[in-house]
Swiss-Prot record:
This is Mannose-binding protein C. Residues 43-101 form the Collagen-like domain. Residues 43-103 are annotated as: Disordered. InterPro entries: C-type_lectin-like, C-type_lectin-like/link_sf, C-type_lectin_CS, Ca-dependent_lectin, Collagen, CTDL_fold. It comes from Bos taurus.
Amino acid sequence: MSLFTSLPFLLLTAVTASCADTETENCENIRKTCPVIACGPPGINGIPGKDGRDGAKGEKGEPGQGLRGSQGPPGKMGPQGTPGIPGIPGPIGQKGDPGENMGDYIRLATSERATLQSELNQIKNWLIFSLGKRVGKKAFFTNGKKMPFNEVKTLCAQFQGRVATPMNAEENRALKDLVTEEAFLGITDQETEGKFVDLTGKGVTYQNWNDGEPNNASPGEHCVTLLSDGTWNDIACSASFLTVCEFSL
């Protein structure tokens, strides 16, 4: 074997011996410290050891990004808050159109009122002509029914009228022409016997008694009726006679 051929082998042997000397030296140093350890060449890697015990429990982590749940039911209404401060005034609006003249409306309303009043007066005249009698500023109407005096008084009042009460001969004649049978007048002496007054309590100044009347022939003759000839008779208020009411025009 030539020198050049064996040179690599010699170098490898030298390196190996050097490494072995180094490891032997390290092992000797360890053996001096712990005599039970025997020095030798390094062994091959062993198989992996068993898993170690579980470590201590870590701190609680942050909530994860889970799926969003469904919306819950509405909560109870909270208490009413305190009133807020007034807002700032809004901008001034545009100028409006000129208003209409109210005088035209007033004149129109006055004209329409006059027309309605005229029509109402015409209707009154028709009613009086067909159903009643008009004299001066009074109109007399009858429903053709007979009833006691208090019922006559109530019925006339319901229609904003009064029991017919002639205040003069002209009104008495108008009543006579209207009725064909005995009718109550709005005159009584219920408060004071022999003192006949109208339903307002005012003494009557016009009277047209029949001969011998009033005679108070029977108890309770405190009312007055108009006879067919236009004269008056005192009679019991509980009796039933024709109803005649008067209305102011």
